[in-house]
A protein has these predicted regions:
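Cell-envelope/extracellular polymer assembly enzymes that use nucleotide-activated donors
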Residues: 2-4, 33
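A conserved acidic beta->alpha catalytic loop
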Residues: 22, 38-46, 62
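Short, acidic, metal-binding catalytic loop of nucleotide-sugar glycosyltransferases
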Residues: 22-31
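Short beta-strand/loop segment that forms part of the nucleotide-sugar
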Residues: 31-40, 58-60
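Glycine-rich, basic loop-to-helix element that forms the pyrophosphate-binding segment
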Residues: 60-77
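Short aromatic/hydrophobic "clamp" motif used to bind/position activated sugar donors
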Residues: 82
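Conserved donor NDP-sugar-binding/catalytic core segment of glycosyltransferases
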Residues: 94-127
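Single conserved hydrophobic/aromatic residue that forms the stacking wall/gate
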Residues: 142-145, 149
Length: 149
């Protein structure tokens, strides 16, 4: 197993269904599993996802919170790499394979974060992010501040 995709759901059955469908439709050329951890949803999620053979469904009878629910998913994961995905995410490209390829080409990197490009209904980008704080980012911000004076 190359990648375990871990999703936490709490009363977002419709969004989570769309997320899962996008993973399946957009992912190829990589071996992956989808692990869905349900944080005691009351919106019918259990009835929908417990029957879905394409996913590994884990139901918690209490809301564990996001972090503990992810840890529950990690315990069940078989993949060499873990891909944490929010339930309201739709993949538009072969992101799981791109993630896997990056991990394989960069074995010295042990942890990473990937930010999404948000798009509106017309596929225009929505600015939704900033820079990570790194020495380079601090220097860049400091230099830019002095240029504007």
């Amino acid at each position: 197993m190359d990648v375990s995709v871990i999703i936490v759901n709490y009363n977002t059955q419709g969004l989570t269904s769309d997320c899962i469908e996008s993973i399946i439709a957009q992912t190829s050329a990589v071996e992956y599993e989808i692990i869905l951890v349900d944080n005691a949803s009351t919106d019918g999620s259990k009835e929908v996802f417990a029957q879905d053979k394409r996913i590994k469904y884990i139901y918690s009878d209490q809301n564990l919170g996001f972090g503990r629910a992810n840890n529950l998913g990690i315990r069940e994961a078989k993949g060499r790499y873990l891909f944490f995905l929010n339930s309201d995410t739709i993949l538009l490209n072969n992101a799981v394979k791109l993630f896997f390829d990056f991990c394989e080409k960069n074995p010295d990197r042990k942890i990473g974060a990937v930010g999404a490009v948000l798009k509106d209904q017309n596929q225009k980008n929505i600015h939704s992010y900033g820079r990570f704080i790194t020495p380079g980012a601090v220097s860049y911000t400091h230099l830019r501040a002095h240029e504007t004076k």
